[in-house]
Amino acid sequence: MFLQLFSDCSMRILVYGFGPYREFHDNITARIVRSLPSQAGLKKIIFPVRFQRRQFIDALNRHRPDFVLGLGQSSRKRIEVESRAKNYRRASKSKPWRPILKGKPKSLPTSLPIDPGRWAGISTDAGDYVCNYSMFVLLEEIDRRQLRTSFGFIHIPYDFDHRKACRIVDRILRKFALLRVSEQLEPAFTRLRA
């Protein structure tokens, strides 16, 4: 199990998901986060679905993780690893697009390898809601402060089988933890500055 790997290498991991929103009263990401065993070195957070920069920055400051994995619910057909966050948001279809942070790049890459394995696809579009917002805010903060934190984000279909989703998240976490331990997974800021 990936948690044993984390405890063996003193790695600090932050895994986050989101609570209910709109018509979704049961967010699959909250269930997955709650399913992860509690252990030293692993912090689990379920954020409210809000465009609130402070909640994400506070979590980064409080836990100082080596690796952050965000989980978001989607209407897609398969699990997808996000490769970048875009610097725009839109709270609803009736509201105009606007930048998350003015004067910042149009997009920022995550620090995960391009190939997540056969159990997930790659996405270049994290949407325009709070998932993308959290990604951009955290990646920009990691870059601005040149933190040694690796970052990744996974979108999970809302109707995906919960047990299967937990197994896939576990595999992805193990894969990325092994890469980080072997120093093949760079901190996010080194990729942002490449």
Residue ranges and their predicted role:
Residues 2-129, 138-151, 157, 162-177, ...:
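N-terminal catalytic or cofactor-binding beta/alpha core of small enzyme domains
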